[in-house]
Curated annotation (Swiss-Prot):
Residues 1-25, 79-125 are annotated as: Disordered. The gene is Hs3st3b1. The lineage of its organism: Eukaryota, Metazoa, Chordata, Craniata, Vertebrata. Glycans are attached at N82, N258, N329. It is a single-pass type II membrane protein. GO terms for cellular component: Golgi membrane; plasma membrane. This is Heparan sulfate glucosamine 3-O-sulfotransferase 3B1. Its EC number is 2.8.2.30. Disulfide bonds join C336-C348. It comes from Mus musculus (Mouse).
Length: 390
């Protein structure tokens, strides 16, 4: 047996001397409370992080850009507004030539508002909550115009926590209407109560069927049109086309049907799109003027916060987007957002934004301004706003 100790006891008789006992387990209740507290802390952190990202998110830095495709179609003689005997014929293409998206001169595919960069991906935390809400048809649509600054406006609006927008252009009301509203709705992001669903497709403004189709979806849809001096818009359109197809004819040769006679070729989409008054007429047959907002592409560059204030009021949103969200990029000459959506870093959208335009002869610019002047004045009258292009 074991060694005897004083008092006649063996070492085996002394509890815990050579065989230490494990500590008693913690009470089950205490263990459960600790686990519950840890889970609560993790959930609270994720919730606050998601909220912070939603409230401070800003879209990728926006630069108003240039360029698009050139198209030609068989002309049809039309007269300029307020002129009984036009100095030069206005030849419009067939009804669907602008909306078809087929470019005989430079190939298919809208380049302007099919942004060269995909929108920023949502953060993992935001994705955790992406299953909330439901998909709704858009309550507001940016319908035009191409190369006017629609991508800039949409990205600026995405700073607002109550605006949810589709990143790519759906082209539903001009190219995919046959797929039905259920297909269209499925393209939309999920929204919560109080949030607005938006999309932008600039070609809608020059698509004759679009006004009736959007009205059939909802007569209450709010429409936003970003417009820009039609001469600089046409040059911007051409500039982007030139970057994709360096072998296309010169701007001057595409502008005129007969250079010596000074006849403008309005079958070229770069010229046709700038006839804003003509394109606005069918929209006013389906929507009251009060449901349309006309945004200045020039002021979107010089005073983005001012134009965004008008847009937020039009959409019934709280004025959250202000001067503090923007800074001016001296290199490109355009405003940018201080924070990209889903991150805290500034970012300018698109390396092609702010690129130099080709030099156009002064005489060509003068003839174009003379051509557009009556259409511009008619547009000012129709919208109640002088954009100062003349």
């Amino acid at each position: 047996m074991g060694q005897r100790l004083s008092g006649g006891r063996s070492c085996l008789d002394v509890p815990g001397r050579f065989l230490p006992q494990p500590p008693p387990p913690p009470p089950p209740v205490r263990r459960k409370l600790a686990l519950l507290f840890a889970m609560l802390c993790i959930w609270l952190y994720m919730f606050l992080y998601s909220c912070a990202g939603s409230c401070t998110a800003a879209p990728g830095l926006l630069l108003l850009g240039s360029g698009s495709r050139a198209t030609h179609a068989q002309p049809a003689l039309v007269t300029a507004p307020n002129e009984t005997s036009p100095k030069m014929p206005f030849r419009a293409p067939p009804a669907n030539s602008l909306a078809a998206g087929k470019d005989k001169t430079v190939g298919a595919g809208s380049q302007e508002e099919q942004s060269p960069e995909a929108p920023d991906s949502p953060s993992p935390i935001s994705s955790f909550f992406s299953g909330a809400g439901s998909k709704q048809l858009p309550q507001a649509i940016i319908i035009g115009v191409k190369k006017g600054g629609t991508r800039a406006l949409l990205e600026f609006l995405r700073v607002h926590p109550d605006v949810r927008a589709v990143g790519a252009e759906p082209h539903f009301f001009d190219r995919s209407y046959h797929k039905g509203l259920a297909w269209y709705r499925d393209l939309m992001p999920r929204t919560l109560k109080g949030q607005i669903t938006m999309e932008k497709t600039p070609s809608y403004f020059v698509t004759r069927e679009a006004p009736a189709r959007i009205s059939a979806m909802s007569k209450d849809t709010k429409l936003i049109v970003v417009v820009r001096d039609p001469v600089t818009r046409a040059i911007s359109d051409y500039t982007q086309t030139l970057s994709k197809r360096p072998d296309i004819p010169s701007f001057e040769s595409l502008t005129f049907r007969n250079r010596s006679a000074g006849l403008i070729d309005t079958s070229w989409s770069a010229i046709q799109i700038g006839l804003y008054a003509k394109h606005l007429e069918p929209w006013l047959r389906h929507f009251p003027l009060g449901q349309m907002l006309f945004v200045s592409g020039e002021r979107l560059v010089s005073d983005p916060a001012g134009e965004l204030r008008r847009v937020q009021d039009f959409l019934g949103l709280k004025r959250i987007i202000t001067d503090k969200h923007f800074y001016f990029n001296q290199t490109k000459g355009f405003p940018c957002l201080k924070k990209a959506e889903g991150s805290g870093k500034p970012h300018c959208l698109g390396k092609t934004k702010g690129r130099a335009h080709p030099t156009i002869a002064r005489e060509v610019l003068r003839q174009l301004r003379d051509f557009y002047r009556p259409f511009n004045r008619k547009f000012y009258q129709m919208t109640g706003r002088d954009f100062g292009w003349d």
